[in-house]
Amino acid sequence: MEVRKLSISWQFLIVLVLILQILSALDFDPYKVLGVSRTASQADIKKAYKKLAREWHPDKNKDPGAEDKFIQISKAYEILSNEEKRSNYDQYGDAGENQGYQKQQQQREYRFRHFHENFYFDESFFHFPFNSERRDSIDEKYLLHFSHYVNEVVPDSFKKPYLIKITSDWCFSCIHIEPVWKEVVQELEELGVGIGVVHAGYERRLAHHLGAHSTPSILGIINGKISFFRNAVVRENLRQFVESLLPGNLVEKVTGKNYVRFLSGWQQENKPHVLLFDQTPIVPLLYKLTAFAYKDYLSFGYVYVGLRGTEEMTRRYNINIYAPTLLVFKEHINKPADVIQARGMKKQIIDDFITQNKHLLAARLTSQKLFHELCPVRRSHRQRKYCVVLLTAETTKLSKPFEAFLSFALANTQDTVRFVHVYSNRQQEFAGTLLPDGEAFQGKSAVSILERRNTAGRVVYKTLEDPWTGSESDKFILLGYLDQLRKDPALLSSEAVLPDLTDELAPVFLLRWFYSACDYISDCWDSIFHNNWREMMPLLSLIFSALFILFGTVIVQAFSDSSDERESSPPDKEEAQEKTGKTEPSFTKENSSKIPKKGFVEVTELTDVTYTSNLVRLRPGHMNVVLILSNSTKTSLLQKFALEVYTFTGSSCLHFSFLSLDKHREWLEYLLEFAQDAAPIPNQYDKHFMERDYTGYVLALNGHKKYFCLFKPQKTVEEEEAIGSCSDVDSSLYLGESRGKPSCGLGSRPIKGKLSKLSLWMERLLEGSLQRFYIPSWPELD
């Protein structure tokens, strides 16, 4: 009896849930959700979707039901934006792909089967979160369909990178990476990274277009290019992947030596320049993303306040080094145009700051696009926008008329007036249209006030009768015109159609052709080996087979010829070995296995050119052994260094270099600060600053793991006696000569003695028993 009652209860529960699901499915009307009629056009549907999406987005609307409402809006737009799904919904009340009588018969079976699956496999009963809709509601608001990806994500990827996850139902690995994905999404979305999720089961066309043939897959999109993430799914790896998508030249490292050149580039680049002062040696990811979003409008630089030589900048611009400070410079490099300072800068604050300072105070019109932005078309009588245009000749330095025009613009900043200037020799048609009497203004500057009436180029304008010299009378006349214009817009009596501006900053034809060719080759490469590799496999197999047939015989013949030559020349090689054997130094049998085939040690100089390849990007497991020397000790130390390390050159993981102490003392002292047992680095204002002698120091640098081992030479008896004999020398004389002569009266023999124990140190290095000093990052080698 009890079993029968339990069975009836379960049946009643099943029927009740089934009825509720059917009613909820019938209540969903995409037209009502978007608030449009059944005859609405795609433009109306898209407009309504954008309006509702902005209103109900969970990040902006704190209503508890905002997320559910946003999901309904997205589903409604997905149905109505697809003509096939919309037609199916209008005819059968559902957005599926099947039609007609078969579709109507399958609807009841689908509802019951859907309920059956949810009942037996829902996580609320058995905790198996295989259904993606039940598994993670956070993915719902990031779901992409093909039209949304093509029309919105790809164009938007030219302003910000996108991180997209490909998932599916019954994906165990997808469940495994969910916690990491949630954490990364929450972090990167706040920084401005676009997020997307593609369900491979429902959006097969989009998944195939992206080249994702397995789940889970994570990829990045920037500038329309797709890059796959091929590393362990952890937070740090995903963050580095997004950072690697960005171009490397977005932010320039600014120091006390180059900040004047950086800020003075506004005239050539026609852009404001932004500087961020911060205490971290690495550029923040938020700042890089901002630089990518506004790369067409501003130039970005970064100042690490912990670097030597930045004190002058911090004093000059009154920077608080204990909090991040953002400055924007326009035409004047001595004083920033705007400043913000905050310990925790948010993306919205930075975006508002950058948007308010996107253009120079009196920007130069270099393209038609910039003309549209600075001088927009009038939308109504209340939204009039006037442009005051200075027509002047191009000069290498700022001319007096332009400086006067700039000072006038600074003193008369208004929302309805924008000040710009044009180089008459570069935009001759544009300037000729605004100057009715070109001969009267030949070689002189002129000022015109204009208002755009439509996008076709129609403008009304007024040109000042006399040339612009920048005098006080000229400023007074221009100010009178602007005051009169507020009361009587009919002052602009002349009318004309302006020609389109020539793009002055566009690359020349050959460069454009080269860039287009590179992009085309890159797209072809991606389409062959990335997106459509499965379809291209037969063709690739055919090509490689043909190449093997054509060149196989040639390669075999070449190897046979070389083997014949080797068989015919053993006596010559024996004679050569006897000759070289006389010149090579003798070594013990114990070290004979380490002796390379070369009869010399290859030692390269560590400079700013070889710094990246020989250290920063050194392969894992490889080390660079660097000798510190000066110009006066170079010959003697290199000879002794080569003799000491010769027996260790048989290892392919060791590289040998030398560093000039005269050129890169600051770099060396920065590294030695991380050595726990190293002597303290003196202050640069100390009178004994330049007396410290680092010649003979040897550093074993591991570029991949960012650590180094230190060899410090021990003073020999001869060296101590030589130094003692110099103690009576006048200290001022010693200071004057110490820069070029680090040791007084030391011959080459005591200098070579500094490296007498280097071979023992090298053996300990290979054993791994030396102390390691880790550093956060490799400093730049200036």
UniProtKB/Swiss-Prot annotation:
Glycans are attached at N631. CDD domains: DnaJ (cd06257), TRX_DnaJ (cd02963). Residues 29-93 form the J domain. Residues 1-25 form the signal peptide. Residues 563-582 have a biased composition (Basic and acidic residues). It is found in: Endoplasmic reticulum membrane. Residues 562-593 are annotated as: Disordered. It holds the Pfam family Thioredoxin. Coiled coil: none annotated. One of its GO terms (cellular component) is endoplasmic reticulum membrane. InterPro entries: DnaJ_C16_autophagy_reg, DnaJ_domain, DnaJ_domain_CS, DNAJC16_TRX, J_dom_sf, Thioredoxin-like_sf, Thioredoxin_domain. It comes from the Eukaryota. Residues 26-535 are cytoplasmic. Residues 119-247 form the Thioredoxin domain. PANTHER family: DNAJ HOMOLOG SUBFAMILY C MEMBER 16. This is DnaJ homolog subfamily C member 16. It comes from Pongo abelii (Sumatran orangutan).
